Amino acid sequence: MSLEMFDKEIFDLTNKELERQCEGLEMIASENFTLPEVMEVMGSILTNKYAEGYPGKRYYGGCEFVDEIETLAIERCKKLFNCKFANVQPNSGSQANQGVYAALINPGDKILGMDLSHGGHLTHGAKVSSSGKMYESCFYGVELDGRIDYEKVREIAKKEKPKLIVCGASAYARVIDFAKFREIADEVGAYLFADIAHIAGLVVAGEHPSPFPHAHVVSSTTHKTLRGPRGGIIMTNDEELAKKINSAIFPGIQGGPLMHVIAAKAVGFKFNLSDEWKVYAKQVRTNAQVLANVLMDRKFKLVSDGTDNHLVLMSFLDREFSGKDADLALGNAGITANKNTVPGEIRSPFITSGLRLGTPALTARGFKEKEMEIVSNYIADILDDVNNEKLQKNIKQELKKLASNFIIYERAMF
């Protein structure tokens, strides 16, 4: 029996989502379009298999084939990131980070991470997160120019003496200097933990410096710029840390791994290892630079005055409208983005004075410089007259026509 016959409600809603993804423009920096081959194996019989433990050391029988699958995922991950050890079992980036903390430090120890309001992530010590409740957290941020001042980070680290320093961000448009972070970590005797969830796809293509050999441990999601399934990974070059990480993930915070997702990670890694991937990642950065240049030419303020990666962060501190207003206006025109706090923020986190835009998903559809210039100018048109609903409606129709030339999926399920 087909899904349409068995559960028409879910079938219809899934197809409405297909329509939304195909007709609109996805510009949330953390979202992307994965391969049909990835989704195909995620919907396979591998979802039936329990496999607590690790390859060759399972608590259940019948794991000979899933052992081979997980081993393949591990080997591809190691090759991709040029590291010695990899754990591919984390169900998400947040659980990967939780596993890193559990492996490296003890509850109550101090961690130093980027402030959430400056572009960090919840799991880097934010008080509302378990990372900010189980561990004592302190923060560094960006200056008013939107960039990390590494001397300021050094001063904070020397004062706070953390056991672990987290480098990585969810809304930082510039290159992260992992070597400088390692210098600082060594000076205070801390572990350096790099969370590259947002930039991993650029890193493996040589479009952003690698955290190796500087970081003791590296985590990432497998979606975002990697375009794989939703999930997490942890990597290191230290055998003893690898053992601690494995124990922290299982049996520490997870039980049976999601073997259908681990297989999908392996498929994604195969794509990431291809020459085609390097072309894609380069275009992601090129498209982001086109976006940044058009917006600046149209007199909009960007945090750090540009971008080195896949995203731009707009600041509306000099405007009458908020990030929430901008988010809504773009949404009415068929562009999905997200409001975001900015350095010098004057509004609440639920309103904000910024907007984060990313190019990974549009690039996955085949958008290049020509299309990005069109889209970027439409964004500027909308934000120049943010309350003009008629304009938003007209632009939505124009963008729908543009999107129809770049269909990413022909069907909702694979």
Swiss-Prot record:
The modification N6-(pyridoxal phosphate)lysine is found at K224. It is an enzyme of class 2 (transferase). InterPro entries: PyrdxlP-dep_Trfase, PyrdxlP-dep_Trfase_major, PyrdxlP-dep_Trfase_small, Ser_HO-MeTrfase, Ser_HO-MeTrfase-like, Ser_HO-MeTrfase_PLP_BS, SHMT-like_dom. Coiled coil: none annotated. It is found in: Cytoplasm. One of its GO terms (molecular function) is glycine hydroxymethyltransferase activity. The keyword Lyase does not apply. Its main location: cytoplasm. The record marks H223 as: Plays an important role in substrate specificity. Signal peptide: none annotated. Pathway: One-carbon metabolism; tetrahydrofolate interconversion; Amino-acid biosynthesis; glycine biosynthesis; glycine from L-serine: step 1/1. (6S)-5,6,7,8-tetrahydrofolate binds at L116, G120, H121, L122, E240, S348, P349, F350. The keyword Transferase applies. Homodimer. Catalyzes the reversible interconversion of serine and glycine with tetrahydrofolate (THF) serving as the one-carbon carrier. This reaction serves as the major source of one-carbon groups required for the biosynthesis of purines, thymidylate, methionine, and other important biomolecules. Also exhibits THF-independent aldolase activity toward beta-hydroxyamino acids, producing glycine and aldehydes, via a retro-aldol mechanism. Belongs to the SHMT family. This is Serine hydroxymethyltransferase. It comes from Campylobacter jejuni (strain RM1221).
